[in-house]
Swiss-Prot record:
Substrate binds at residue 113. The gene is truA. Keywords: Isomerase, tRNA processing. This is tRNA pseudouridine synthase A. One of its GO terms (molecular function) is tRNA pseudouridine(38-40) synthase activity. The keyword Isomerase applies. Disulfide bonds: none annotated.
Length: 247
């Protein structure tokens, strides 16, 4: 039974998240329905990351097993045709046959995320579902300085959801950079894995630094508190993009 790796792009605005759920449409469910329409097979696909409602992806990775072999470009194009027919905001960017031991989630060695903030007085029209609108000037250099306190191996209890199901709050952040281009501020994060709501918690707290409400050292103090109450407000989902997975 051949195994295929799919690289997936999606607009998460109208989905309950990546994972199949009973309370609304999911990205996983949309792809599984497309596979069923194409092949007649009921499959369960596994993604590299379980993005929340409203979170987007430009490089989510998933795998699935099919009973017959497919030319990979045919599989990609056929799935995209079925997704388009169902008016899904999901696109298969690439399909590749992989060894049976490949696992989209557990074989990953690094995940890359981007959080976008647009800092300007005027509300967003075109970018309203793809960035966090902050109607004031932010000091991105102070935000970047603060972010470096979060790089490395730490207990991130402060920056994970109270509903996080991970066994341990310990994670290693390889990269957390804040840059600015005009009115766009980008927060780029890299790690092998992240905790639930971790990046959005980072972004919300870094915004406080950018506003001057916190100093960079205040972020370090929040980290060391190991207390969810020490976290700033969680940033909204629309600014978060799952960019890439390394294997």
């Amino acid at each position: 039974m051949p195994r295929y790796r799919l690289t997936v792009e999606y607009d998460g605005s109208d989905y309950v998240g990546w994972q199949r759920q009973e309370n609304g449409p999911s990205v996983q469910g949309a792809i599984e329905k497309a596979v069923l329409s194409l092949t007649g097979e009921t499959v369960s696909i596994r993604g590299a990351g379980r993005t929340d409602s409203g979170v987007h992806a430009m490089g989510q990775v998933a795998h699935l097993d099919l009973t017959r072999e497919w030319k990979t470009h045919t599989l990609r194009n056929a799935l995209n045709a079925h997704l388009a027919l169902a008016a899904e905001r999901v696109s298969i960017l690439d399909a590749a046959e992989v060894p049976p031991e490949f696992d989209a989630r557990f074989s990953a060695i690094r995940r890359h995320y981007l959080y976008r903030i647009i800092s300007r007085r005027s509300p967003l029209a075109l970018e309203a579902r793809r960035a966090w609108w902050v109607p004031k000037t932010l000091d991105h250099e102070a935000m970047h300085e603060a972010a470096q306190h979060l790089v490395g191996h730490h207990d991130f209890t402060t920056f994970r959801s109270a509903h996080c199901q991970a066994n341990s709050p310990l994670r290693t952040i390889d990269r957390l950079d804040v840059t600015r281009s005009g009115e766009l501020i980008e927060i780029r994060a890299t790690a092998q894995s992240f905790l639930h709501n971790q990046i959005r918690s980072f972004a919300g707290s870094l915004k406080l630094v950018g506003e001057g409400k916190w100093t960079p050292d205040d972020l370090k103090t929040a980290l060391e508190a190991r207390d969810r109450k020490a976290c700033g407000p969680v940033a909204p989902p629309e600014g978060l993009f799952f960019m890439q997975v390394d294997y």
